């Protein structure tokens, strides 16, 4: 599971890691916060380490019996081919804002670097794209199984939401059906992050009821 975007990579990756582990699917995480398999194992020098280091971490995850790996794919890492040779079941685009332009120079270059992740999908696997972002078209790659998410219009979209001091509740429309979810994570940005986790777990095979139960408990 590869996740790219200016904001939301870490939160979304760790959320999916925590949810899958809670559901009994042993899952690793590689990213800004380090290397985890259910719990913290070690720090990493970069959000997306060098390719040889990534392969070592993947071998370790496999030895530990992991079924999934959540990986943060940074624009620097993608541009420098640190993920070369990897294939993904899920590629996620969260958003693109004006950062890292000292390195990429233009927003177009920045988007094209992140786009590389979407050319690394296995056949018939899933590209999950924020339909509310101005740069979404870079990530809707022909031949991919493209899924959009949104607060307005998409394959999965938020119809209503309510944020209190203790939790957020929101309803998701998918295939004209309405599903309600609740999370301890606060803020509209975390509803976006939660929606990505809902889509991925749904595509893995969990029901919306099963997903809501675990989303309610993890942070």
Where are these regions (language model features)?
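Phosphate-binding loop of NTP-binding sites
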Residues: 1-131, 135-144, 174-177, 195-204
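Adenine nucleotide phosphate-binding catalytic loops in nucleotide-utilizing enzymes
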Residues: 104-111, 115, 144-219
């Amino acid at each position: 599971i590869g996740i790219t975007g200016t904001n939301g990579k870490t939160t979304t990756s760790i959320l999916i890691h925590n949810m899958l582990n809670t559901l009994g699917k042993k899952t690793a995480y590689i990213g800004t916060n380090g290397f985890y398999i259910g719990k913290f194992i070690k720090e990493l020098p970069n959000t997306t380490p060098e390719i040889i280091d990534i392969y070592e971490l993947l071998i370790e995850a496999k030895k530990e019996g992991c079924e999934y790996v959540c990986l943060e794919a940074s624009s620097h890492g993608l541009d420098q081919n640190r993920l070369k040779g990897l294939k993904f079941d899920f590629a996620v685009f969260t958003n693109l804002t004006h950062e890292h332009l000292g390195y990429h120079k233009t927003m177009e270059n920045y988007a094209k670097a992140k786009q590389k992740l979407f050319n690394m999908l296995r056949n018939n696997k899933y590209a999950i794209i924020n339909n509310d972002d101005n740069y979404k078209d870079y990530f809707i790659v022909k031949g991919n199984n493209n899924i959009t998410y949104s607060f307005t219009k998409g394959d999965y979209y938020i119809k209503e939401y309510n944020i209190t001091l203790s939790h957020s509740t929101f309803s998701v429309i998918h295939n004209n059906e309405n599903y309600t979810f609740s999370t301890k994570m606060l803020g509209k940005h975390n509803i976006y992050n939660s929606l990505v986790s809902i889509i991925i777990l749904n595509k893995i095979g969990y029901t919306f009821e099963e997903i809501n139960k675990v989303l309610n408990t993890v942070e």
